Regions:
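Non-heme Fe(II) oxygenase catalytic core, chiefly the N-lobe of the double-stranded beta-helix
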Residues: 1-108, 121-130, 136-150, 215-220
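Non-heme Fe(II)/2-oxoglutarate
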Residues: 118-119, 123-220
Length: 220
């Protein structure tokens, strides 16, 4: 709920942006496996309204930083090209070390913005440093509202206003939790909640209310 990060989400996806999901990616030395090259997103590749941001983006906060050995690699610009034939790219490169791919290199505490359509993957962590990434993503509301979900991060379902609002309460709770932790900071004003006059307070009841909130992940 960092106000600067949520402001970035609004600048990319509009002030009525919707949450996607949250996850930890842990890649320990020697046992962190490879993740094959892939593009995220399943629902909008053939949409008449397809554009480079239609499947949203992820913030990737690096706890210990990331290196070329333990980090994610990306192929710049591929988020604009639609669904790619990855097998052809591997064949053209002669290996899974794709031509033009670059690693995401970060210091501890750095936050990366990664478009979900960008071709990305990672190699086995053969180094000596762990990578822990706190991943949290956001969508344009128009990308999820009334859309049948992809059924990957949550059960396939149509994301109606009620579902989107229910999933978005996590943002409200997070904003209040941060305000309690940093009382001198100006909290982010999340338009869908403030315009509806809805206020969420972070307390013991909130923990119970958030139980299994991820079952409503807006998976597109």
């Amino acid at each position: 709920a960092h106000p600067q990060l949520l402001s970035v989400a609004a600048s990319i996806n509009g002030p009525d942006f919707a949450p996607f999901n949250e996850a930890l990616f842990i890649k320990d030395p020697g046992i962190g496996a490879a993740v094959a090259w892939h593009q995220d997103g399943v629902t909008h590749w053939d949409s008449a309204d397809f554009e480079e941001d239609i499947h949203g983006f992820n913030f990737m906060a690096q706890v210990y930083g990331s290196t070329a050995v333990n980090g994610v690699w990306v192929l710049p610009g591929t988020h604009k090209l639609g669904k790619l034939n990855i097998n052809e790219l591997v064949a053209e490169s002669g290996s899974e070390r794709l031509k033009g791919a670059v690693p995401i290199i970060c210091n501890p505490g750095d936050v990366v913005i990664c478009n979900r359509q960008l071709l990305h993957g990672s190699f086995p962590n053969c180094g000596f440093e762990p990578r822990v990434t706190v991943n949290f993503g956001f969508h344009k509301r128009s990308s999820v509202l009334g859309v049948m979900g992809g059924g990957i991060h949550s059960d396939a379902q149509v994301f109606d206003e009620i579902t989107v609002a229910r999933r978005s309460r996590a943002i409200g709770y997070a904003i209040d939790a941060r305000a309690q932790r940093f009382p001198d900071e100006t909290p982010y004003d999340y338009a869908p909640l403030s315009e509806a006059g809805v206020v969420y307070r972070w307390n013991a009841s909130a923990r119970l209310d958030l139980k299994d909130y991820n079952l409503d992940d807006l998976s597109i």
